[in-house]
């Protein structure tokens, strides 16, 4: 028996031209997930669509441009979306539960663990939790951005074995198949490198409008030991075939050395929002990435942003690529004073005795892979 998180996007659950829900697809999804639940699997559905459904009900021809407009549409649409899911699953005798999360819920350690306990209890009670971002109250600077990231964080939170991302394409392609007859579907990706992510963001990969976020989600999931598959959403029955071992869509291999990160490390690496960045020299990059060492002030070349002690920062290599994240022992102002200097100089530079010798201790540091 496995724990499975399935994410369905707006493009799969509604008609883009009218905003109407694709009830045949959603009915098939409800039937598939109900069969899996009755077979003993633990299922979570992460569903987008509240804003789109709200716009359709309000008769809006376009998505609102303002944050307030989107939040108002989500307030209208979320209830309608859950009502639809309750009818579809209810007709099959399968209870569902609504769980709305914000980024703050996963940034705060106590709320993070409480969300985990709530989802576990909903499983124990035999429900299929249906998760969405709480769009009505989420602030623009602290949004997940899309439900791909949310689904990956939830998969890690509950220690799922599988994350299935349902979308409007068959998977990840080597190029745009509409323009390149040589484009091929990639059945497996063994490494989600920063270069691959940059390629997706640069629109050289088919479906890159939403593919970059799916690659990010697969990387987050991999850090938690979760296998990810991207596949076309109009045939939800494929989920059962994927669990049976069939090669459908694009599967992302679990290539992280050392396996699953601890729950705390996953919270540090992916639950928090970075407040700034540290640019490192080559020696520091090697020590942190290859040697698993703490980051010393001597290896910091530059400080980006303003932040306080204990904030999460991104660690940047010489090519400008993020390769790790960690909680800092010093504020940005203090790091500007001690960067590039030896640890024994810290007290004199800051005028305070007994300061930690590390800028980021390895216990509070996560390398990204």
Swiss-Prot record:
Top-rank lineage group of the source organism: Bacteria
A cellular component annotation (GO) from this entry: cytosol
Domain PUA: 275-353
Gene3D superfamilies on file: Acetylglutamate kinase-like (3.40.1160.10), PUA domain (2.30.130.10)
Entry-linked SUPFAM superfamilies: Carbamate kinase-like, PUA domain-like
UniProt binding sites for substrate: 48, 135, 147
Location of this chain's protein in the cell: Cytoplasm
Protein's name in the database: Glutamate 5-kinase
GO biological process: L-proline biosynthetic process; proline biosynthetic process
Function: Catalyzes the transfer of a phosphate group to glutamate to form L-glutamate 5-phosphate.
Keyword Transferase: yes
Enzyme's top EC category: transferase
Pathway(s) the chain acts in: Amino-acid biosynthesis; L-proline biosynthesis; L-glutamate 5-semialdehyde from L-glutamate: step 1/2
Organism in which the protein naturally occurs: Gloeobacter violaceus (strain ATCC 29082 / PCC 7421)
EC number annotated for this UniProt entry: 2.7.2.11
Principal subcellular localisation of the protein: cytoplasm
Xref: CDD domains: AAK_G5K_ProB (cd04242), PUA_G5K (cd21157)
Keyword Kinase carried by entry: yes
Lineage: Bacteria, Bacillati, Cyanobacteriota, Cyanophyceae, Gloeobacterales
Catalysed reactions, semicolon-separated: L-glutamate + ATP = L-glutamyl 5-phosphate + ADP
Molecular functions (GO terms): ATP binding; glutamate 5-kinase activity; RNA binding
Similarity comment text for this entry: Belongs to the glutamate 5-kinase family.
